From Swiss-Prot:
Binds 1 zinc ion per subunit. The modification Omega-N-methylarginine is found at residue 311. It is found in: Cytoplasm; Nucleus; Nucleus, PML body; Endoplasmic reticulum. The gene is TP53. This is Cellular tumor antigen p53. The modification N6-lactoyllysine is found at residues 98, 117. Its cofactor is Zn(2+). Phosphorylated by VRK1, which may prevent the interaction with MDM2. Phosphorylated by CHEK2 in response to DNA damage, which prevents ubiquitination by MDM2. Phosphorylated by PLK3 in response to reactive oxygen species (ROS), promoting p53/TP53-mediated apoptosis. Phosphorylated on Ser-13 by CDK7 in a CAK complex in response to DNA damage. Phosphorylated by CK2 following UV but not gamma irradiation. Monomethylated by SETD7, leading to stabilization and increased transcriptional activation. Monomethylated by SMYD2, leading to decreased DNA-binding activity and subsequent transcriptional regulation activity. Monomethylation by SETD7 prevents interaction with SMYD2 and subsequent monomethylation by SMYD2. Dimethylated by EHMT1 and EHMT2. Monomethylated by KMT5A, promoting interaction with L3MBTL1 and leading to repress transcriptional activity. Demethylation by KDM1A prevents interaction with TP53BP1 and represses TP53-mediated transcriptional activation. Residues 80-270 bind DNA. It holds the Pfam family P53. Residues 303-314 are annotated as: Oligomerization. Belongs to the p53 family. Residues 44-88 are annotated as: Interaction with WWOX.
């Protein structure tokens, strides 16, 4: 009766499972063990180690080095060239108040402006250029040791979500309120520029105004890094031939009025010759210096006596 209570598949079986049977040595294996040396016997009994699959990470390329922007192969000219059409620039009169967002110094030929604020630039011509004429704006570094570097925004401002849908994030100069603006990257020089069609002045006006924005501070690390820049404005025909050129220095800062006053005072103290202001500018140049020196105050002389006469007294 107890035998019948056991399960049909006996737990104890004289037949070993196939995996265990493979681990046991047969009589032939034992004979070969003694016939061969111990080193060969160990090689026979040891199962070959399975080859580990090659990890996918090993096929990845080495990390790329930090990006270094290429140097430009050429430096645009910054010399003033009115051309046959008398091309020149002008700026709206603005003072040095603390609240001003954009101000131009004729004595320095320098524009001081805040980040991303409107900077009106007037275009003056003596005669109307041909149809298809374009106006190009490009920034370059002023000092000779930096001229071959391309002016671009700092990495922080490149990542800012302030795009107007037209300008690439690395471009410093933008045109405000003009959907026909084209932002170009030169394949040969790697320089950035923005081009707009030239529009003749409206009725009753003598100049055309383009509103520019500067999208990075002059002090930004990784960008201009306190290096002075120039903005070159060129007048070109439809084929890209030069019709006129003018330029001015730009400083993008938090307080344009204060910085303009400071630089003009330093300029007068140095006594440097005053550059000619643009013919279209409505702001007069500041005097470069004066020969008169402040008169010292006269000190009262001790030991003098004065007589005071009073009328109406007995």
């Amino acid at each position: 009766d107890l035998w019948n209570l056991l399960p049909e598949n006996n737990v104890l079986s004289p037949v070993l499972s196939p995996p265990m049977d493979d681990l046991l040595l047969s009589s032939e294996d034992v004979e070969n063990w003694f016939d061969k040396g111990p080193d060969e016997a160990l090689q026979m009994s040891a199962a070959p180690a399975p080859k580990a699959p090659t990890p996918a990470a090993s096929t990845l390329a080495a990390p790329t080095p930090a990006i270094s922007w290429p140097l430009s192969s050429s430096v645009p000219s910054q010399n003033t060239y009115p051309g046959v059409y008398g091309f020149r620039l002008g700026f709206i009169h603005s003072g040095t108040a603390k609240s001003v967002t954009c101000t131009y110094s004729p004595s320095l030929n320098k524009l001081f402006c805040q980040l991303a604020k409107t900077c009106p630039v007037q275009l003056w011509v003596d005669s109307t250029p041909p149809p298809g004429t374009r106006v190009r704006a490009m920034a370059i570094y002023k000092k000779s040791q930096h001229m071959t570097e391309v002016v671009r925004r700092c990495p922080h401002h490149e990542r800012c979500s302030d795009s107007d849908g037209l300008a690439p994030p690395q471009h410093l100069i933008r045109v405000e309120g003009n959907l026909r603006a084209e932002y170009l990257d030169d394949r040969n020089t790697f320089r950035h520029s923005v081009v707009v069609p030239y529009e003749p002045p409206e009725v009753g006006s003598e100049s055309t105004t383009i509103h520019y924005n500067y999208m990075c501070n002059s002090s930004c690390m990784g960008g201009m890094n306190r290096r002075p820049i120039l903005t070159i404005i060129t007048l070109e025909d439809s084929s890209g031939n030069l019709l006129g050129r003018n330029s001015f220095e730009v400083r993008v800062c938090a307080c344009p009025g204060r910085d303009r006053r400071t630089e003009e005072e330093n300029f007068r103290k140095r006594g440097e010759p005053c550059p000619e202001p643009p013919p279209g500018s409505t702001k007069r140049a500041l005097p470069t210096g004066t020969n008169s020196s402040p008169q010292p105050k006269k000190k009262p002389l001790d030991g003098e006596y004065f007589t005071l006469k009073i009328r109406g007294r007995a």
